[in-house]
C-alpha cells in the first residue's frame, strides 16, 4: 500500500484578495486540514488582510500556516507587471514582507500622507523587492529566463518556480518551459494549484466575482472566467495522480514549506508603545485643574455615587511643554531605532538625566491627579486601589500605554476639545485620577478586573471620546507626534450585506438594472436574504419559478454576504508602536485624505494581543461644547438660578436636579443623549429616574442583552413593588442588590459566574468575551454543562439554575459594561440639564452639530418650539453660517437676561457651499444689504447661488415674497466674467399668484429640510375629516384598546433584531410624536407603504401600559393630502 506524498499548498488566495478569491480564510484552512496537507500558505494579492483570521483557525486545526502575499511587481519580466509570491521564512522576512506590501500601496519614501491608489494600480518595483529579500522565499509562477535569473541573483537558494495543472489548453507547454528554465538556471520547480476556492462548489461564485471585478456579465466575460473548477484546494493523493510524471515538484513544495518557519504567534503582544518622557519640573500644572474641582463636590456632597461632570479642564496660566517621546525631539516624529527594548523593562523606566519616564512618570502623575481629584490626599480605599492598579500595570509593562493616552487627552484639553474616556477604562482609578475618565470607580463600586487583570493576559483597552467635529485635530496630532511609520488607524472591513450583494450578483448575472433595483429595494440594508420568498418577489414583479437567474441571484447573494468589499477606517482605533509599525502589519492610504490605515481590524489586533488606542468621535460632545460656548456668549442674567458660572466646564452643571429627572421621567427627551429613542421614551415613564444611578440603569437596560435575557420587565416590576426582590442564590445579593436581583451589566455576569458556579476570574472573563461576541450563542450554550455543574455543587439546581443560565445567555446578544453605562449617563444628565434650562442654546447646538443623534433637524426645531423657543428662518441679512442665538431685534445678539431666539443658519440651505455663505457674511460685515442687486454685487454671488437662496426664502426683507424673489433672481445677469454685478434691464412687472401656506412649507423642507412657519400636518388637518383622526397629544387621553386613526410625518423607522420582526414607526404632527407598533404580518401586507411613504395614515388600537401609549397598527396608507416636503426619516435597522 503506497502512502500519499507530503504536500503543502504554497499559492492560495482567499476572499481578502478582493474579488479574486471565493473562500474565507477560515474555510481554506479548515479544508486544508481535512485534506491532510502538511502546511498551507495564504498569499493574498498585495495584502495580509486575512492572515490573522487564517492564523486563528490554523491554531484550532493544528495546521502550520505560512505567511505570504502575492505582490504585483513591476520590472521583473518584460511587459506588464508580474505576480510574485513571497513567503516569510523568519521574523526578519515577515518584517520585510510587511514593508514591501506597504511600499506597494504607499510608494517610495513616503513620510507624509500618501495618496490612495486604485487596486489595479498597486505595485512595487523589483528593485525594492530585491533590496528587501532577506528572510523571504520567492515563488515565481512564470518561465521567463531573464526574470528567473534576476530572482536567483536576488534570492539565491530562496527562489523557486511555480507550476500548476488546471486541464486547460497550452498549460503543458508552460510547465515544460518552467521546468527547462529551472534546470538551466539551477532553480527548483514546485507544484502549486493557484488556489482560489476551498471547494469546487464555489466556482460559480468565483465567476461572479470575476465579473464584478471587470465590470462585465457572465455572458460577456469570455476568457476572463476560469474554464473549470480546478483552482480549488486538492489533497496530496489527487495531486500525486495529477503529477505522477513530476513527483519531485510535490516534494519541492513540501521542502519550501519546511523552510518557512515563521508563524504569526511570534508577534503576539509585540511592540510596546514608545515611552513618554517629561522633564522634571514640567509637571507643575501638568495635570490640568478643573474650574470646579471634583474635590469641591466631594467635600460638599460627601461620599455619594454621583460623579462630577468634569469633562473639560481649564488650562494652566501657561501651557506646559508637550512631553517628549523617548528617543526623539518633542516636536518631531522620530523614534528609537528598530529593535529598541520594550515590554516591562521599558515601561518600568526610572529617572535619568533629570527626566521622568515609564512608571516613575506614571506614579508622579497619579499622585498629582489624586490630589486634584480629591482636593488633597485621597481616601484610604482609593489609595489602596491606586496602589493595586499601579502594581499590576508595572508588572504587565503597560505604563507607556497609560501615558500615551494621557498625552493625547492632555493635548485635546490644551486645545479646548471636549473629551471623556469610557468603556472598561472607567473601571480604573488610575484612569480617573489621570483625567482620562470622569467616573470615580471606587465610589461606584466598579470591577477593575473588567478592565485589566494578570490572569487574562490581554492588553487593556481605553476608549476616549472627542468632539466629532474636532477629532481630526487629535488624529493628526498622533500622526505628527509618533510618525506615520509608527502610527496607523485600525481598518474596518466593509463586507457585502443584503442589498450590495444582490446588486453586484444581479448585474453579473445579467439582470436588468430595473430588476436589480426592484430586487434590492425589497430588503433592508441588513435584512437576511433568506427571508426573500415568493411573496416578496411577486411584490417586485419578479417570479423565481420563471427566472432561473433570479433564483441564482438570491442563492449567490446569500453566499456573497460577509465577503469583504473594501476597507474603511475604524471609528477611532489607533495602533502606535515603538519600532516601525510597517514591520508588524502593512500600512496603506485610507480613502480619506490625510489618513493611513493598517490592514487588520480590531479583532485581528485582539487575536494577537496588540495594543491599540481608541480615539472616537462623539456628536454629543460636539453639541455640549457648542451649547456651553453659546451660553458663554449669551449668558443669562447673573441672578438666574440656572446660569452656568463657568460655561466652559461641564463640572459646573448642578448635579442631581429634580427638575431634570422629572423632565426625563415624562419622556421629554428629544435630543438628549442615549435616551431619545422610542424604546427609551417608552421606558422613561415606567422607570421614572430619580438619581444618577437610575440614568446608568436606563442607558444599559435597553440593550439586546437585557432584552433577550428577559430582564427588563422583572426589574421594572420589582422597582414598582409589584414583584418581590429575590436572589436565586443568597451569596449573590451583594452583586445584584443595586439592580434588584436582576443582572444588567457585564461585571455582574462575571461576578455571578465566580460566586454561583465557581469560575475563576479568568474563566469568568472568557465567559464575558463569549457573551459579547457576535453569533456566540452556540459557544455559550456549550459552556452550560460547566455552569450547571458548578451551580449544582453550590446547591443551585432546577429552576434557579435555569433562570441564571437564561439571564447569562441573554448577554450573548450584548451585555453592557456598568462603567460604560456610567460614563454615558454623565452625558445623559448634562444634555438633559441643558435642554431643561437652556432649550434655545441646546437646540442651536444640536443643529450645528449635525449629522448626529436620532432625529432630523426639522424634528429638533419642532421640539424646540414646543419648549417655548422662538425659531426664525434663514435670512441673508441676519443668519450666520451656523445657527445662532439672537435677541428680540433680528440679527442682534441677545442681551444679558433677554430671552434668546434661535436663528437658523445659512448652513441649512441644501447644497450651498460654505465659501458662498462666508462671502455673504464678509460682505455683510461692511453694512447691511439694501437690495438684491447690492447683495449680488458685494458678495459676488452667481445666479445659481442667488436662486438657491431665493428658493429657500433666505432673501428676507430684500425680497419677502419667495416666488417674487426667485423670479427676480432669475433676472440676474453676468457682468465682467465671473462677477455678477446686478440685474438685467427692468422687465414688465409680472403678477405672480401668492403661494399657499402648504406651498411655503413644502418649499422650506425641499430647500432647508425644516420649516419655521408651521408643521405640515397643521396645514392638512382641516381636510382630514373633522375629529376622526387624532393628534399625538390626544392619544394620551384615549383608553386602552380604543380604536384610533392617526396621521403624521414619518420621522423614524426601526426594525431591531431583538423585536422578532416588529417594526416601530414614529409619526410627528403639530402636537408631538405618536408611536406605531407594526406587527410582522401587518408589515408584510403594507411593506412598500411602511418603508417608503413620507406621511402615513394609520388605523389600529391604543395600547396603554401605565403612561406609555402606542398604537398597534391594523392598516396603513399614504396620506394623500400631505404636501411634498421631501423630508427624510431616520431609518434604523
From Swiss-Prot:
It catalyses: DNA(n) + a 2'-deoxyribonucleoside 5'-triphosphate = DNA(n+1) + diphosphate. GO terms for molecular function: 3'-5' exonuclease activity; DNA-directed DNA polymerase activity; nucleic acid binding. Signal peptide: none annotated. GO terms for cellular component: cytoplasm. Its EC number is 2.7.7.7. InterPro entries: DNA_pol3_alpha_NTPase_dom, DNA_pol3_alpha_thumb_dom, DNA_pol3_finger, DnaE2, DnaE2/DnaE/PolC, DNAPol_HHH, NA-bd_OB_tRNA, PHP_dom. Its main location: cytoplasm. It is found in: Cytoplasm. GO terms for biological process: DNA repair; DNA replication. Keywords: Cytoplasm, DNA damage, DNA repair, DNA replication, DNA-directed DNA polymerase, Nucleotidyltransferase, Transferase. It comes from the Bacteria. It holds the Pfam family PHP. Belongs to the DNA polymerase type-C family. DnaE2 subfamily. PANTHER family: DNA POLYMERASE III SUBUNIT ALPHA, ERROR-PRONE DNA POLYMERASE. DNA polymerase involved in damage-induced mutagenesis and translesion synthesis (TLS). It is not the major replicative DNA polymerase. This is Error-prone DNA polymerase. The lineage of its organism: Bacteria, Pseudomonadati, Myxococcota, Myxococcia, Myxococcales.
